[in-house]
Amino acid sequence: MEANKGKFYHETGGESLKPNALFVGYKPMFMSSNHYLQRLKRRFGVKKAGYSGTLDPFAKGVLVVAFGHYTRLFDHLNQEPKVYRATLWLGLHSDSLDIENILGVEVIPPYSKERVEEIMGALEGEISYTPPKYCAKRIGGRRAYDMARNKEEVELPILTMRVGRLSLLHYTHPFVHFEAEVSKGSYIRSLGGMIASRLGCYGALSSLERLSEGEMRFEGYRELEPLEILPYPKIDATSLKEEFLHGKKLLASDLGNPKEGKYIAEFEEFFSIIEIKEGQVVYLLNRMEKC
C-alpha cells in the first residue's frame, strides 16, 4: 500500500524504531491498549509513546501508534472510516455487550438469514445509540467502566455513529458474523446489541477485530511516512524557512493568499502544519522533525 512506504520493522526483531515514528500495530486479544503500548515501549526502548483509538481488551486488531514528537500527529490523521469484523452471539446476555461480563445464555430459535440482513440494512446510515456502560468514557472525571465494576449507576449520553456499511458475512445460529464500516468513536459492541435487540433477543459480541483506520492497515510493523498520509495539501513556503523555524507571525499574503484551510509546509529538515484563517497563518504544528 502506498501509505505504508518505509523501513520494515518486525515486532520480534532486534531493530529499533526512530525516536519519532508513526506506525500501525496489531493488538492481541485480552490485553488493554495501554498494556500493549507499554510492551512496545520496552521492546523498542522509547520513553514517549501514544496510540490513537482505544481497542477493548477482548478485541484485537489495528492500533495506530506513535513515538516521540509524532504523537502530536494523531489529531491530523484521517482515521475514517474504521472497519471492523465481529461475531455476534445471539442469546448471550452481557452487561458489557461482550464475553467479559456474562450474565447468562438464552437458547433461542434461529432467524432467517433474510431477517438478519433486513435488520442490518436498517441500521446503515446515521444512528443514535447509548455506549456500553463498560467503556472508557468519563462521568464526572471517573471512567464509566470503574463505576460499572463498582455496581454504581452509569448514565451515559446518547451518541451518534455513522454506519457506512454493515455486511452479513455468514450466519450460523446463534452466531452472526458481520463487517462494519463506521465513523470514528463508534462502539461496535453497541451496534451488535442493537442488531440483537431488533431481532428481539439478547446479544453480545464474542469476537471483535479492527481491520483498518482510514487507509491504515496492519502490514507488519512498518513505519509510516507522515507526509504521505496526512490529508492536507502542500504549500510552497521555501523562501520563508527562517520565519517557520522560529514561528514568526505571517499573513496569508506572504504565502500568495491561498484559500482558507489546512496545509503542510515542507522543508529539508522539518515540516509544519498550518491553517490559513481570516488572512492569518496559524501554526498548528511547527517544526516537526523529518525522519
Swiss-Prot record:
The UniProt entry, under InterPro entries, shows:
PsdUridine_synth_cat_dom_sf, PsdUridine_synth_N, tRNA_psdUridine_synth_TruB
Which Pfam families does the UniProt entry name for this protein? Answer: TruB_N
GO terms under biological process: mRNA pseudouridine synthesis; tRNA pseudouridine synthesis
**Reaction equation(s) it catalyzes:** uridine(55) in tRNA = pseudouridine(55) in tRNA
Catalytic center residues: 56
What keywords is this UniProt entry annotated with? Answer: Isomerase, tRNA processing
EC identifiers of the protein: 5.4.99.25
What Gene Ontology molecular-function terms does this entry list?
A: RNA binding; tRNA pseudouridine(55) synthase activity
The record's section on HAMAP family has: TruB_bact
Q: Which family does it belong to?
A: Belongs to the pseudouridine synthase TruB family. Type 1 subfamily.
What is the purpose of this protein?
Responsible for synthesis of pseudouridine from uracil-55 in the psi GC loop of transfer RNAs.
Record-linked NCBIfam families:
TruB
Q: What protein name does the entry list?
A: tRNA pseudouridine synthase B
Q: Which gene encodes it?
A: truB
